[in-house]
Amino acid sequence: SSLINKLSMEMKKLKLKPAVLAVDPTSHVTGGAILGDRVRMSESTDTGTYIRSIASRGATGAIAHSVRNSLRILEYAGFNPIIIESVGAGQTEVEISKIADITVVTFNPHTGDSIQTIKAGITEIGDIYLVNKSDLDGATQLFQALRDFIGTGEEEAVILKTSVKKNKGIKELASTLKELMKQKIKDKKSSEKSRVESELEDIILNNVRQEISTMIGKSKSFSSYLKKVQEKKMDPFEAADKLTKNFIK
C-alpha cells in the first residue's frame, strides 16, 4: 500500500487520474473491510486520488464480487488507471489477472517464500515483475532469481526494482505502466473476448454457488448424509456426490 501510495502520486505527475481499489481482509466481527490499506495511503487521499476499500468477504481468491462493478463506475467517472490491490497471493493474483489489463506481481526480499512463489507458477500471469523494498538485504539475489525464472520466455519480461523508503524506481514504474497502457489499448479488441468470457463464467458460478447454498439450507437429506459421514458410515466424497445429483435433477 505504501508503494501504491507513491505510485499514484507519480502517475498524477504524468497527467493521469488514478483510483485505487484496495481489496482488504474482511473483519470477522463486522463483515466489513479492515481499512489498513487506506490508512497507509493517506498521502494519496490528500492529493485527490480516489481510494475505495472493498472487503474480500470470502469470495473466490480474495476478489470481492463488487470489484467488477466498482471498476465500471470508476471508468465512467473518468479514472485512469484504476489500480486493484489484492489481499493475498496465489489464487488471488490469478483472479486479478482475469480482470485487469495489466498485472504487476510484487515480491519482497524478506518474504520467506518468495523464491518458492516464483517456482510455483505465479510468474506466468504478470506483465511486470517487481522487487519492492530493494534497499533491503537479499533484493539483488531475488531480482536475479526473477530474471532466471522469467527471462526464459519468448517475450522479454519487464522486471523492475523499487524502494519506497528511498523513493527509488517509482518514476520508472509509473512510466513503464503508462507505456504498457498505451500498448494494451491497441491490443484491447483481441483481449476483450477472453475478459468478457471470464466475467460471464464468474457470474454463472456465483449464481450456481448461491443456488446450491440455498438448497443445502432447505434440504432434509443434507442432515441425513451429514449424520452418515459423522458416523463413518459414508465418506464425504460419496455423500457430496449423492447430494449433488439430488440438487441438479
Predicted features by range, described:
Residues 1, 5, 61-68, 140, ...:
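Electropositive phosphate-/nucleotide-binding environments in soluble metabolic enzymes
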Residues 109-137:
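Flexible active-site lid/hinge loop adjacent to a nucleotide/diphosphate
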Residues 34, 70, 95, 99, ...:
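Alpha-helical scaffold elements adjacent to nucleotide-binding pockets in ATP/GTP-utilizing enzyme cores
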Residues 2, 6-92, 99-105, 110-114:
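Nucleotide-state-sensitive switch-loop elements of NTP-binding domains
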Residues 24, 85, 122, 132, ...:
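Residue-level signature of catalytic and energy-coupling elements of molecular machines
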Residues 128, 133-186:
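Canonical P-loop GTPase G-domain recognition
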Residues 161, 172-248:
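Long, well-ordered amphipathic alpha-helical subdomains in the mid-to-C-terminal portions
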